[in-house]
Amino acid sequence: MENNSFNWLQDWYYSQCDSEWEHSYGIQIETLDNPGWIIAIDLLETELEDREFQEISVKRSDNDWISCLVKNGKFQGAGGSLNLLEILDIFRKWVEAENSLKKES
């Protein structure tokens, strides 16, 4: 990806902040004890809240896996210890794909 996905996520979060959204919604990144990562990104009251997302589940090994879905108004991603950027890249590609479709319309 062209830019660092952490920087991109920071920019996406900032673009959602409107003096209201950030008081009820946000982004959570936590560790799992198996070990791994879990990410929850609130989509309610964003342009993404009604967008369809095709669930992704890949298990390469016990330590190299990802699972991403949208449920209850949240993008939810989980993965192994070294899969955090892969999860962020999946979210980013989904957002950017939707944005490019809007530009073409």
Predicted regions and their residues:
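Helix-rich interaction surfaces within compact, conserved domain-sized segments
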Residues: 56-104
